[in-house]
Amino acid sequence: MSQPTLLDTPLYALLHKDDIRGFNRERPQNGPIDMVGGDFRGLDLRELNAAGIDFSDAYFRSADLRGIDFRQASLEGASLAHAQISGAYFPPELSADEILMSMNFGTRLRYRTR
């Protein structure tokens, strides 16, 4: 199993400094943002503009994800163990059961095909 990674990018550094407004201001407006395998454990990410971000294989243990709209983000393989997700939107490819399994047991999110 892969381990969470501290990514070496300016945008990732903003998130780790809890500067969500700075991240939203500095992020590219189009094109994907690579946060694959990133370590987001325990971070408060509320108000994050997650559109276009690839969070594949990321770790969100105990992170505050309340109110984030992940519908335009990739979360395949991410772990949500003990994360706060009230009011968050998830991609339609993720079932509620899949999200609950990840929250309760730390399993990796698996996308279902339509």
Provide a role label for each language-model segment:
Residues 1-5:
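Terminal non-domain segments
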